[in-house]
From Swiss-Prot:
Annotated GO biological process: translation
Organism lineage: Bacteria, Pseudomonadati, Campylobacterota, Epsilonproteobacteria, Campylobacterales
Entries under Pfam families matching the protein: Ribosomal_S6 (PF01250)
Keyword RNA-binding among record annotations: yes
Annotated CDD domains: bS6
Species of provenance: Sulfurimonas denitrificans (strain ATCC 33889 / DSM 1251)
NCBIfam families in the cross-refs: S6
Protein name from the UniProt record: Small ribosomal subunit protein bS6
Length: 137
């Protein structure tokens, strides 16, 4: 079995329940073809670089999984049939370097999934001393 990553963009006009149902259907497609889902990363609603049809935004979701290479054509065929998906891309990780990168991505996605929503990292903004002096005047 090889390691793969799928980025799918779901239509923004769907409700949260419909989006979740579509993501569950996508995961079912993968598992029904013998795949094992390693991690998933919901990236949320994002602005697209260019409009796809009449959509300027989309719900991005990444799925990391392992599956037999012969099943990829069927998985992609089922993705093409789904009218709720704006776009999808499948990335194959097969060299040792790529597999190492895939493992790191999976670990990062799993860590993000287990982190409570309230504990999101907040970066501290550092104001240079020169700017602080200007503000005081």
């Amino acid at each position: 079995m090889r390691n793969y990553e799928n980025l799918v963009i779901v239509k923004p006009t769907l409700t949260a329940e419909e989006i979740q149902a579509n993501i569950s259907a996508i995961e079912e497609i993968i598992t029904s073809n013998g795949g094992e889902i390693a991690a998933r990363d919901a990236m949320g609603m994002r602005k697209l670089a260019y409009p796809l049809g009449k959509n300027e935004r989309g719900y991005f979701h990444v799925i990391y999984y392992s599956v037999d290479p012969s099943a990829i054509s069927e998985i992609e065929r089922r993705f093409r049939i789904n009218e709720e998906l704006l776009r999808f891309v499948t990335i194959k990780y097969d060299t040792n370097r790529e597999v190492t990168a895939w493992n790191q991505l999976v670990q990062k996605a799993q860590k993000k999934a287990t982190q409570p929503a309230g504990e999101a990292k907040v970066e501290e903004v550092v104001i240079p001393a020169a700017l602080e002096e200007d503000e005081e005047e």
